Amino acid sequence: CLKRLQPGEMSLQLLLSGCRLRLEQETGVLGRFADLTRKIIQPDSDETVRFSDGIFIRGLIPQRCNTRFSRLAILNCYYTYKGSLTTPICSENVTWLIVKPRLPATNNMMRKFRRLETPAGKNPPLMCDNFRPVQPLNGRTVFEVHRI
């Protein structure tokens, strides 16, 4: 049975995914994605990054998770917890999924990501240092998912 919610009853829940990076000399798909950021540096850009540009989600999944059983979703390799946004307003309505294995990244790739810009009116306009210090758990539980 579905219930129609009234505006005062609605609540916005967010599901965000994140990853941890490991600095390396060379990378594959994530490096190609970083190269494509030149098309979308400004948020109001009319450019589009398409599948034909060679970016496939399964290529971002670390090899030890990239099996035929979990190729499109890292079902066996993540942490999850109830948390908050990392930038103001820091709302606490977020479920985080963090990829367990670290993804490879290079210094050059990180420089490309740091050129990305935020929407107009932000100062500074660059999308870097958009994090906050690690927060206390405050009674939250972090779950490590081994298998679904």
Swiss-Prot record:
Its main location: secreted. It comes from the Eukaryota. Its cofactor is Zn(2+). SMART domains: Carb_anhydrase. Component of the acid-insoluble organic matrix of the aragonitic skeleton (at protein level). Residues 1-146 form the Alpha-carbonic anhydrase domain. One of its GO terms (molecular function) is zinc ion binding. SUPFAM superfamilies: Carbonic anhydrase. It catalyses: hydrogencarbonate + H(+) = CO2 + H2O. Pfam families: Carb_anhydrase. The lineage of its organism: Eukaryota, Metazoa, Cnidaria, Anthozoa, Hexacorallia. It comes from Acropora millepora. Keywords: Lyase, Metal-binding, Secreted, Zinc. Gene3D superfamilies: Alpha carbonic anhydrase (3.10.200.10). This is Putative carbonic anhydrase.
